[in-house]
Amino acid sequence: MKNIIINIQYCCKNNKNIPKKLYFKKWIQKILCKKKNINIITIRIVDEWEIKKLNFNYRKKNKPTNILSFPFNKFIKINYKLLGDLVLCKNIIEKESLKYNKSLESHWAHITIHGTLHLLGYDHQNNKEADIMERLENKIMLSLNYKKPHILKSF
């Protein structure tokens, strides 16, 4: 896990049930394992009010969400690439985990993987993009010994 530097900011009232940094590194490493650069990612874990504010300011959506990704993708010095920031909402992730009957760890993994793929340029603005991203998320989750998060549709 030498090719990743993760900075974590804990910015919520209750830090209980947040995965350890080692887990975030393991999940992100699965995606970046073939990258030769040292990749830097900041993860900020927040409450609903902060993610709602960010979602409105950057996406004009006045509601909380589980994750926001802010890609940067610039070299800050030789072989050091600042990929960007992930802002994860602890409360939303916990609620979704219960709602969709997923283990909390698995859902944290999925949302982190989803956000990291956004940092790398993947998106889901249309059915084709969504299918590509969901297949990749399923493959990565299975490789980490979690269940597939998506049931894929045929278009």
UniProtKB/Swiss-Prot annotation:
Cell compartments where the protein resides: Cytoplasm
Keywords: Cytoplasm, Endonuclease, Hydrolase, Metal-binding, Nuclease, Ribosome biogenesis, rRNA processing, Zinc
InterPro entries: MetalPrtase_cat_dom_sf_prd, YbeY, YbeY_CS
Keyword Metal-binding: yes
Positions that bind Zn(2+): 114, 118, 124
Cellular-component GO terms for this entry: cytoplasm
Cofactor(s), by name: Zn(2+)
GO molecular function: metalloendopeptidase activity; RNA endonuclease activity; zinc ion binding
Any Gene Ontology biological process: rRNA processing
EC number: 3.1.-.-
Cofactor annotation comment: Binds 1 zinc ion.
Top EC class of this enzyme: hydrolase
Any Pfam family: YbeY
NCBIfam families documented for this protein: rRNA maturation RNase YbeY
Record-stated family: Belongs to the endoribonuclease YbeY family.
Protein purpose: Single strand-specific metallo-endoribonuclease involved in late-stage 70S ribosome quality control and in maturation of the 3' terminus of the 16S rRNA.
Name of protein: Endoribonuclease YbeY
Gene name of the record: ybeY
